[in-house]
Amino acid sequence: MPATLRQVAEAAGVSIPTASRVLSGRAAEGRIPEATAERVRAAAAKLGYRPNVLARSLRTRRTRTLGLVVTELANPFYATIAGAVEAAASASGYTLIIAASGEDPARALEYLRELPSRPADGLIVAPAPGSEVEAALIELAGAGFPLVTVDRLLPGLDCDRVVTDSRGAAAGLVAALTAMGCRRLAMAGGPDGVWTARERSAGFREGLDRAGLPFSEHLFRSGEFSVEQGRAAAEVFLASPQPPDGIVAANNRILAGVLETLAARGESARNVAVAGFDGVPYAPFLGRPIAVAEQPEAEIGRAAAGMLIERVEGCKDAPREVVLPLAVRTFPPEPAGTEGGGS
C-alpha cells in the first residue's frame, strides 16, 4: 500500500499542510525553511510516497461534471443542500455526481479518490471525521484541485468553504429557552470529532454564561448525530435528581430521539421545552415549547456551487469563507383545550 501524505508528515515531523505545500512545489508560498522542505522530501523518498498526479492532471481536463460528497442524503439538511447544488450546477451547464459517506471515513476516502478519476472538475464535500479524510482533502487542495467544503471546517485545509454560525445559533437557542422560563438546561451534543458539533457545544456553554446559568456535566452528553443519541441522552437527563426543564439537541436527528423519549414519558415530561437545529416542519404541532435554529440549506448549496464553478473556470483568489447566519424561531404550545377547525 503506498504511503500517505499523513505518514510523510509524521516522518518529517511537520503538519500535513506543510508536507502538502512542499510536495506540490509551493514551499516558498508558505515560507517554509529549506531545511524543513528537505526533511519532507527525504521522508517522501524513503517512504516511497507518490503524489496525486491524477488530481493535478485534471486541472487542465474539463468534463463539466462536479462531485458532491455528503454524510447522508436521508437527512433533509443534506438533501436540500444537494438539491440546491444540482440546480445551480445545471443552470451553469454542469452535471452533478452525488455520493453519501454515512459518516464512515473509509467510504469518504473511497469517494475522494474515485470522484476525481471519473473525472469530476471539482468537489463539494461535507467532510466525514478522521485524519485520513483530512489528509486526502489537503492533498487534493494542495494539488490545485477545485474544492469547497460545506457545514464543517477542517484545521489546515486551505480551500473555499461555506459554513453557518453554529456557535451563535446555539447561544441563541439557550436565550430562547430561558425566555420561555427554563432554568435547568441540558444538551444532547454531537460527535466530539466534528467541528459543527464542537461549535454548537461551545455556543451552548456561552449561552449559559450569558444567562447566568451553570453548566452541569450530568446535563451534557455528546454522541453521534443520531436518533439513538437523542433517546439515550434524554433518558439520562430525565433520570437526574434535578432533571432539566429544557433540552438542546445538536441536530434534527438527535432532536427526534429526544422528542421520542419525552413523548414516552407522557405527562411527567410534558412541560420540558426543547430546542434544535435544521428545519423542523412539525414544530408548531408538538404541543410543547420548542425553539429551532433554521439553517439556510438552499443558500449553503447555492453558495458552494457558485464558488466551485468559479474555481473550475479559473478563479485564482485566496481561499474564501462564507459564514451564513441561522434564524432562531420559537413555537409555544397551543393553549390546553383549544381545537383547530376548518372546512
What are these regions (language model features)?
Residues 1-62, 338-342:
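N-terminal helix-turn-helix DNA-binding module of bacterial transcription factors
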Residues 15, 50, 90-95, 121, ...:
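Residue-level detector of anion-binding/catalytic polar loops
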Residues 16-21, 59-72, 184-190:
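Short beta-strand segments enriched in small/hydrophobic residues
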Residues 53, 70-80, 98-107, 129, ...:
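Hinge/beta->alpha junction and helix N-cap segments in small-molecule ligand-binding domains
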Residues 61-175, 179, 237-239, 243:
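Alpha-helical recognition/docking segments in bacterial nutrient-uptake
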Residues 91-92, 143, 208-215, 240-243, ...:
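Short helix-capping segments at alpha-helix termini
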Residues 235, 239-343:
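Flexible loop/turn connectors
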